[in-house]
Amino acid sequence: MKIGIIMGGISTEREVSLNSGREVIKYLELLEHEIIPIIIDKKEDVMEKAKGIDFAFLALHGEFGEDGTVQSVLQTLDIPYSGCGPLTSAICMDKDMTKKILKYANINTADWVNVSSVENIDYEAIEKIGYPVFVKPNSGGSSVATNLVKDKEGIKEAVELALKYDKEVMIENYTKGEEITCCMLNGKMLPVLAIRPHAEFFDYTAKYADGGSDEVVIELEENLHKKVEEMALACWKELKCEVYVRVDMIVKDGIPYVLELNTLPGMTKNSLFPKSANAVGISFAELLNSIVKYSLEVER
């Protein structure tokens, strides 16, 4: 099968995408597929460079990768691709929309407000949420332009920074607890990972630098494990996920809260999904092969 590895892109996460793409190429080549690296520098590249491939493995992140755009283009070209469809991708990229759906479905998530300019910052609403808060681009990833703000004085500057990366900014209550991630493959949860960043939170450096954080497989207490699994599965169903996603949570006082869903989890050597799969004996090559297999089974 002729598989195009689509990577690069136009978002702030381009370098992460290129790293993911290189790793995917290295391991998919072991499975005797014909691999074609497709580096995207502008949106129009997909229409031209994807011609002739049998399957597109998406190693993109952020804008044009995780927001449903490239998925729609590939469907128009009748090229099957990895991961979730356009609607789920677009919704999960929009943190505000995701949290509204989670709240409607009675799935725990931290309180938040969104703003689109410095002028419409509602300081009273933020006070009700309670400091400290995370200020971050509504549609960003990899913790780019994300800041932990401990009082009112720091809000304006953090919002201004986040607005450089997105037209909308989320201000979310900082729920202090243990951060965990649940990797979902074809609707089933792989072993849970605990994320223990060496910085104050799981920022860009902690995510992608060697030694930036410790990510370890953990055995949750039975009742908590059941709650976490039920919540991850509820997210999968409510947001109509397909093939694979990563559900990030915080556990505080034995109660899990969903942070966000990642529809195209990173595939670098430091990435969480391969670590979780490896804990049940699924090698990186086998994981990639499963993603291709399950993606081909989805009716688009």
From Swiss-Prot:
Coiled coil: none annotated. Binds 2 magnesium or manganese ions per subunit. Mg(2+) 1 binds at D248, E260. ATP binds at residues 126-181. It is an enzyme of class 6 (ligase). Keywords: ATP-binding, Cell shape, Cell wall biogenesis/degradation, Cytoplasm, Ligase, Magnesium, Manganese, Metal-binding, Nucleotide-binding, Peptidoglycan synthesis. One of its GO terms (cellular component) is cytoplasm. It is found in: Cytoplasm. InterPro entries: ATP-grasp (IPR011761), ATP_grasp_subdomain_1 (IPR013815), D-Ala_lig_Van_CS (IPR000291), D_ala_D_ala (IPR005905), Dala_Dala_lig_C (IPR011095), Dala_Dala_lig_N (IPR011127), PreATP-grasp_dom_sf (IPR016185). Residues 99-293 form the ATP-grasp domain. Its EC number is 6.3.2.4. GO terms for molecular function: ATP binding; D-alanine-D-alanine ligase activity; metal ion binding. It comes from the Bacteria. It catalyses: 2 D-alanine + ATP = D-alanyl-D-alanine + ADP + phosphate + H(+). Mg(2+) 2 binds at E260, N262. Cell wall formation. This is D-alanine--D-alanine ligase. It comes from Clostridium botulinum (strain Langeland / NCTC 10281 / Type F).
